[in-house]
Amino acid sequence: MNITKAYVIFFLVVILTNSLSNSDVLASSDIYICVTVIETTKNDVCSTPCTIRYGTFECFHDCILEHYRDGNCINGRCCCK
């Protein structure tokens, strides 16, 4: 009986912890929200946030694919020009 009670309590704690945790934070390393912002300075468009996995090389590559001549991470965002 004590083992069953312990399993039920453990199960409820896991469910409660899972429901209270912020699932967006856990999945944020694989999900990128692309918001295009028109810049009025030297760069034409700044969009995807730069992270450890999405750095200068990836930014440059994506900008070239979108027919810009250059791209770099500036202030934490991928900026194409």
UniProtKB/Swiss-Prot annotation:
Main location, first listed in the record: secreted
Keyword Mitochondrion appears in the UniProt entry: no
SS bonds (residue pairs): C46-C80, C50-C73, C59-C78, C63-C79
Subcellular location: Secreted
Alphabetical UniProt keywords: Antimicrobial, Disulfide bond, Fungicide, Plant defense, Secreted, Signal
Keyword Plastid attributed: no
Annotated GO biological process: defense response to fungus; killing of cells of another organism
Stretch forming the signal peptide: 1-23
Top-level taxonomic group: Eukaryota
GO cellular component terms attached to this protein's record: extracellular region
UniProt similarity note: Belongs to the DEFL family.
The protein, known as: Putative defensin-like protein 56
Species of provenance: Arabidopsis thaliana
